[in-house]
């Protein structure tokens, strides 16, 4: 059949509504080229490590596919000429990867964890407030 690839896409956050339509178009291209999609994950909007085109967030997608080189070339051309896709990366893999990704596992685990306490959440609620009456020292008399 074909070779195995892992593809990660960063989609412009304003285009999040069109992500499903984009995925359907890519799925059709892969399946028409006699390819298989082993894994498809929508990671949602996530913080970028650095700004891309003055954006700090993007919609992440990840696919593990098995296709011929010609189909991959068509996909990469679609990614390259689609203004909604900020970045794309296609990596050749040794075999199919159907296990859930680390990001999706950690996303699932977050629902089980209790909410973390912030530093400014103290039991009495007055962190950083001093009870000293001489803080305003002679400022009131000087006015």
Swiss-Prot record:
Stored SUPFAM superfamilies: Ribosomal protein S6
User: What biological-process terms (Gene Ontology) are attached?
Assistant: translation
This protein's GO CC annotations: cytosolic small ribosomal subunit
Q: Where is this region: Disordered?
A: 95-143
Q: Which UniProt keywords apply?
A: Ribonucleoprotein, Ribosomal protein, RNA-binding, rRNA-binding
MF (Gene Ontology): small ribosomal subunit rRNA binding; structural constituent of ribosome
Basic and acidic residues: which segments have biased composition?
105-121
Stored PANTHER family = MITOCHONDRIAL 28S RIBOSOMAL PROTEIN S6 (PTHR21011), SMALL RIBOSOMAL SUBUNIT PROTEIN BS6M (PTHR21011:SF1)
- What is the annotated role of this protein in its UniProt record? Binds together with bS18 to 16S ribosomal RNA.
Q: Which family does it belong to?
A: Belongs to the bacterial ribosomal protein bS6 family.
| Listed name of the protein | Small ribosomal subunit protein bS6
From which organism does this entry originate?
Answer: Xylella fastidiosa (strain Temecula1 / ATCC 700964)
């Amino acid at each position: 059949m074909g070779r195995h690839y892992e593809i990660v896409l960063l989609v412009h956050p304003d285009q999040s509504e069109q992500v499903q339509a984009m995925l359907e178009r890519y799925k059709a291209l892969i399946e028409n080229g006699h390819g298989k999609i082993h894994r498809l994950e929508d990671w949602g909007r996530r913080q970028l490590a650095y700004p891309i085109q003055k954006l700090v967030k993007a919609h992440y997608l990840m696919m593990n596919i098995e296709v011929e080189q010609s189909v991959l070339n068509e996909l990469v051309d679609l990614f390259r000429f689609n203004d909604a896709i900020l970045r794309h990366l296609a990596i050749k893999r040794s075999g199919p990867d159907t296990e859930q990704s680390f990001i999706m596992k950690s996303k699932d685990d977050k629902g089980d964890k209790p909410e973390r306490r912030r530093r400014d959440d103290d039991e009495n609620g007055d962190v950083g407030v001093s009870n000293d009456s001489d803080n305003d020292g002679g400022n009131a008399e000087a006015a």
